[in-house]
Amino acid sequence: MKYSIFILCILSLHFSYSQGNNVTLLSQWSDSSLPPVYDGESVYNEVWGITKDGIEYAIIGSRMGTHIFRVNSSNQLVEIDFVMGKHTGSDAIHRDYHDYQNYLYAVCDEGPSSLQIMDLSFLPDSVSVIYDDDSLITRSHNIFIDTAYSKLYSCSNKNSGGSNALKVLDISTPTNPTFLYNYDLVNHVHDAYVMNDTAFLNCGGQGLKVVTELNQSCIQIGELSTYPQKGYNHAGWLNGDKNIYAMCDENHGLDVKVLDVSDLNDIQVKSLFNSQMGDAPNSIAHNVIIRNNIAFVSYYHDGLQIFDLSDPLSPQKIGHYDTYIGNPAVSYAGCWGVYPFRNGDKILVSDRANGLFLLGFQPPPVTVESPHEIFPNPSNGILYFFKDHGLYADYTLHIYNGLGQQLMQIEGKADYTQLNLENYKSGLYYLRYVSNVDDTMFISKFYIQ
């Protein structure tokens, strides 16, 4: 009876949609003096990150070139250098980056442009361009470096002599790249993920191709040409166990695909997921990187979206941060690229209009399998609420002390929510979950030590 009265006496409040969930803004940079590209708004493009001598660095491209930042001890972005691109016209929309050993490689898909190689050995003070040449690469859409085999894969190449789908360079001498071979058995390669001489190629309308090298040429060892919600196969990333691959189709309203690639002769789609935001029918997943089975996805309209892929059959949304609060119907506006540092607690995100973001994130410390759970329990005041993916990701959490007094209320838009109760004393507390979509409600108890 007391339990029933306790429930009935609780009052419900409603708060507006939050820009972020489980993700915090640490630092943000933009430069109002930079000119936009031809659409009048977009200035920035790809983002990349490196760690050198224990210091984290951020790289972002703009219409004008490459901006390099240090992440200081206060988690603030400090710009330390800028490298002008060979091409800086109003059409300079696409730049891409990858690092190898002590060098940063940069390309542009408008031009005439070039391959630029920057020496990073003088960081944190400056960088220097030691190679800027268009003989091997004039225009390239994306690059990826297979560090184990010292090869640079250049996608969708264009030069005065024509174009080719994929070009592979030898960078075993990092400052003196040399040509190895072209791969043109597909019409187009938009992006690539390469590990140990095996390349997962995103081939637009031709789907996913997997190739490896044989006698200085590529042979196909796997493909997925037909799959649910197929569109323009744009980008993907392999997990650390090399058995799960997340794949984005760059089309309005198409879900991200989770693939089982343990058998390249029989690639299987295990699940699909999307941002679960209000404008999901218009949303476009652009790029993805996986760290420790957590997928960090950049969505044009919806910003950074974070999903736990520990169970590839049921991806769990565990965080988001919207970098673009403008009209969600604007096509291809907003978040462009994402780069989580190795442990996933700091994330770099680029927004086409709003520049570079450094975001903080606390990955789930454990995996739980019950429909809903609070962990750790008991805790020191920092704890996590986790719900089953089958429950709607639109809910309100009410926190009460042992006397039934409400202490806080949190709007949830993800399967996983961090709770900070460090300022509350030790004892018994209650969490009440209320769905904002249906009549689902439950109460759990937890303890603060």
Give, region by region, the residue ranges found by the protein language model:
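C-terminal outer-membrane/trafficking sorting elements
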Residues: 370-375, 379-449
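Bacterial Sec-dependent N-terminal signal peptides
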Residues: 1-21, 377, 405, 441-443
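Low-complexity, Pro/Thr/Ser/Gly/Ala-rich linker/spacer regions in secreted
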Residues: 361-373
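Feature marking well-ordered beta-strand scaffolds used for ligand recognition
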Residues: 17-364
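A general lysine-centric signal
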Residues: 2, 151, 445-448
